[in-house]
C-alpha cells in the first residue's frame, strides 16, 4: 500500500474536563458539517535507544473502529500551541510491530538501527470531533479525553485540537479566539507522544536563572536589528517556562522558599524583557501587518507584569510557597494569558 503525506496545521489547548462538557453547547452556534464520536487506541513504537524520539519523530499504530493506520510524525514547527508538521500514513491490514522496511517506505531515512522496534507506551482516548464552517475555512475541532499509559504510570488526557482542514490560518486564530472560556485553558506544545516518553522518567526543575543569563548573552551576540530571531527565541523560551511550570504540582514548591522565588522571578524577568524591548513587538507587528493587534498585546503584557509583581509582593509578605504557585498557575491558565498567546502566535506564524 502507498503511504500518504499530509501537512498538519493545528492549535492545541490543554483544558479542564469541565470545559470539555461546555464545548458542544458553544459549537452549536456554528454550521456543523460533520460530527462524530470515536474511541482511538494508539500504540507508539521506538527502538531501545529511542532513535525516533531523538529525531523528534513519533511512530504509532492507531486503531479507529476496525481500521489500522501506521503513522510517522516528523519534526515540524511548533510555536507555542501552534503545530505545523508533516506526517506520513500507511494503511495496515493487521496490527503487528512495525518493521524497518515499513519505516523506510514512509520516510527516506539514511540509516536505521539494526535492533527491532518495540512498543513504548499507549494513548487511549475518546475523541469527539466537529467539522465547523467558519468564515472562509473548515476547521476540525477534536476534544480528546482519556489517558497515556507507560508501564505502571498513567497520565490523563484532556485537550482540544483545532486543525485547519481548508482555508487560511488567520481564520483558525480568529475561531479559537472566539472561545468563551475564562480559565483553566492554555496552549500546549507538548504532543501526546512527547508526554508518553516523559511519563515515568524523572523530571527536574530547570535552572531558569542561568537559562535567562544564557539567553541574554546569546541575544547580545546576535544582530541588533534581527527582531525576528529575538522574538522567536523569547517566545520559545516562554512556552518552555510555562509548560514546565504547569507540569509540576504546586506542592513541589511548598517547602522550598527559594524555588518559589526563582520560579516567579523567571516570569518577572520575562515580562521585564518584554517591557524593555517593546520595539521587538512593534517591528514584528509591522512586518506581519498586525499593527491593529499591537495595543491590546502591549496592554496584556503590562497587565500580566503587574500581576507578577503583585505575586512577588504576596510571597514576600506571606512566605506561602504553595499558595503563590497556585496563584501563578491560575494566571497562566487565565483568559488574559490565552488571548495574549494567540496574538503572539499570529506574529510568529510562517516566520523563519
UniProtKB/Swiss-Prot annotation:
Presence of keyword Hydrolase: yes
Any Pfam family matching the protein: CYTH
EC number: 3.6.1.25
Database matches in InterPro entries: CYTH-like_dom_sf (IPR033469), CYTH_domain (IPR023577), YgiF (IPR039013)
CDD domains on file: CYTH-like_Pase_CHAD
Catalytic activity: triphosphate + H2O = phosphate + diphosphate
Domain CYTH: 6-203
Alphabetical keyword list: Hydrolase
Superkingdom, natural source: Bacteria
GO molecular function: inorganic triphosphate phosphatase activity
Role this protein plays: Involved in the hydrolysis of the beta-gamma-phosphoanhydride linkage of triphosphate-containing substrates (inorganic or nucleoside-linked). Catalyzes the hydrolysis of inorganic triphosphate (PPPi), which could be cytotoxic because of its high affinity for calcium ion, thereby interfering with calcium signaling.
Entry protein name: Inorganic triphosphatase
Species, as recorded: Haemophilus influenzae (strain ATCC 51907 / DSM 11121 / KW20 / Rd)
